[in-house]
Amino acid sequence: MREIYIFKDLQDLHKFSAKQIIDQIKIKKDSTLGFATGKTPLKTYQLLVKDHQENKTSWKDITSFNLDEFVDIDPSHPESFIKQMKSNLFDHLDINEQKINIPKSNSSNPDQEALNYENKIRKNNGIDLQFISIGVNGHIAYNEPGTPKDSLTHVSNLTKETILDLIAKNKFSSIDEVPKKAITMGVKTILNQCKKIMMVSFGKEKAQVTKQMLEDKPNENVTASFLQEHPNCIYILDKEAASLLNEETLKKAKWI
């Protein structure tokens, strides 16, 4: 099932994204949820916190897995993904800290940590709902251009484009500060271990890669395009991210 939702109002997009996660918890209180970091999910996370505070949605039985984490960054660093997830979401919920799973950023053996993380996902019987966003070069998680479809959780070398984007977003002040590698779920991991995926993309800067993701044949240059092969992926876009889509794609979309 491939569904495309296009939102005229960005706030409605965030509300819809949050509702997908809240509804999953209501359906299965011990769901396994997959999360992402960066700018895209922030408003959604704020709405999840608001829902927990106002509606008392409980996260105590939830297990979480994050898509990725930098290598060789202190977990207490403000740009480490574990720190971001705690600051933006987990610290404000009743989630059990023992059920929060993110690759260890300070592992002495990142390749082994990647293997361990892959095995942990499998032993958990996968992920019920995974939040994913698309990178400026079309990557999902840190599956950079050229990552094969059969990739499992692995250590990824970040491209220069990704590194410069991190600096442009004021994540790091210089190239020297930016981690050059990340542990990431692989493309095969995402396709095989995630039962449902919600891909969220908004903003003019994402229009070209959103078009490639949805309309190009699945290929390694835009790893997000492999999501076309997932049996249960919904695409949640704003009108700007959808602005370059062709007429055929737009006809299939639901405008909200």
UniProtKB/Swiss-Prot annotation:
It is an enzyme of class 3 (hydrolase). One of its GO terms (biological process) is glucosamine catabolic process. It comes from the Bacteria. The active site is at 68 (proton acceptor), 137 (for ring-opening step), 139 (proton acceptor), 144 (for ring-opening step). InterPro entries: Glc/Gal-6P_isomerase (IPR006148), Glucosamine6P_isomerase (IPR004547), Glucosamine6P_isomerase_CS (IPR018321), NagB/RpiA_transferase-like (IPR037171). Keywords: Carbohydrate metabolism, Hydrolase. Its EC number is 3.5.99.6. GO terms for cellular component: cytoplasm. It catalyses: alpha-D-glucosamine 6-phosphate + H2O = beta-D-fructose 6-phosphate + NH4(+). The keyword Transferase does not apply. Pathway: Amino-sugar metabolism; N-acetylneuraminate degradation; D-fructose 6-phosphate from N-acetylneuraminate: step 5/5. Belongs to the glucosamine/galactosamine-6-phosphate isomerase family. NagB subfamily. Catalyzes the reversible isomerization-deamination of glucosamine 6-phosphate (GlcN6P) to form fructose 6-phosphate (Fru6P) and ammonium ion. This is Glucosamine-6-phosphate deaminase. The lineage of its organism: Bacteria, Bacillati, Mycoplasmatota, Mycoplasmoidales, Metamycoplasmataceae. The gene is nagB.
